[in-house]
Amino acid sequence: MRGRPAGWSPTGSRFGILQDARQGAGRDRRRHGGAREGGVTARYVATPQALAEVAGALRREPRLGVDTEAASFHRYRDRIYLVQVSGRTETALIDPLAIADLGPLGALLADPQIEKVFHDADYDLRVLDRDYGFRAARLFDTRIAAQLAGEAAIGLAAVVEKYVGVKLDKEHQKADWSRRPLPPPMLAYAAADTQHLLALRDALEQRLEGLGRLAWANEEFKQLESLRWTGAPAGGASDDESYLRLKGAKGLTPRSLAALRLLHRWRDSVAEREDKAPFRIIGNDALLGVSRALPASPAELGHVRELPPSLARRHGAALLDAVARAKQLPDAQLPRLERRPRPIKDPGFDGRLENLKAARNRIAVELGLDPGVLCGRSSLEAVARARPTNREALKQIPELRPWQIDVLGDAFLEAGSGP
């Protein structure tokens, strides 16, 4: 979620945003107009010297609000294009395209003396690990806190409006953060993502303390510290089996699957060459439609309902070539969806799982929590498989947190005691 303060105006404000006059390549800097929110100033950091200076100032803060901006909606290569870090009185908008060494930022994130506040930290932490190898210590996630507080709407805008009284908009939610220079409205918008996190954190902490759930949240926050990137390296191509995960692929014949595989590879190569998000080359529905129809001529291609005429004209030759090559493949080389064997369940598994789910749902209603927040399905299945008979056995189930055992333990032992 991306937001900016309501009522922001780029003219006549006292908010100073520093930006390199040459978009990060030169030495001279100039100030752009921006916004000032609640006494917090923000500046655009585009040189190693500026980063060292602002990191030194932020190192004196007890806690920092942190967020990142990417451009996966626009670019093939998913990477971080902006990092926002807010203290009590200053926000740094750090440009990783302009600064080769972000070591001072990594040191801030790793400092256990400084609490780092994110909203929905999972992806931010993973991409910070992927792009820079950064690890973050001592975390507070306002999204998790809102979930454990029983909030139904947990987006940043919703919880900031409820707990801080500031209305954020979504104007630049899908903006292209790879563009340079970033205009002042986008910079002010990005700054708002972190400028309200500290106040939101304090309000949610107070709420969780009142509910007796702060310890639950702290357990969840500690788990975040171990998050690492597990996908392809930054800028890496998608894996060769990713076409099988497209919605609708499982319903295709082997011959159509072969066409989809070749079409998907073609789209990926074009997207990489042009550094555009793959869907901006051609959408998934169009790929599936062509694969299903297996057209042999421009006329037949034009009858594919999912393919816009403009894309048929632009990419028709490449699409027909991929289909023709798929038709020429011998049957032995056609892809086939392998059915994964279903795990063998003992006869009483389904009954125990339903009993556990009913117990979980009952307690979730009593606590005013979403059942999935209280205990997810994978954790329920782990308990059903383990068939614990006491709390010590519950503690041996890695999917369960200690706070969940405290809250659900007795009910789980009773519900899972069947055959």
Specify the residue positions occupied by each region the protein language model found.
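Active-site-proximal helix-loop-helix substrate-binding element of RNase H-like nuclease domains
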Residues: 44, 84, 88-198, 202-205, ...
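Helix N-cap/beta->alpha junction signal
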Residues: 47, 120-121, 283, 376
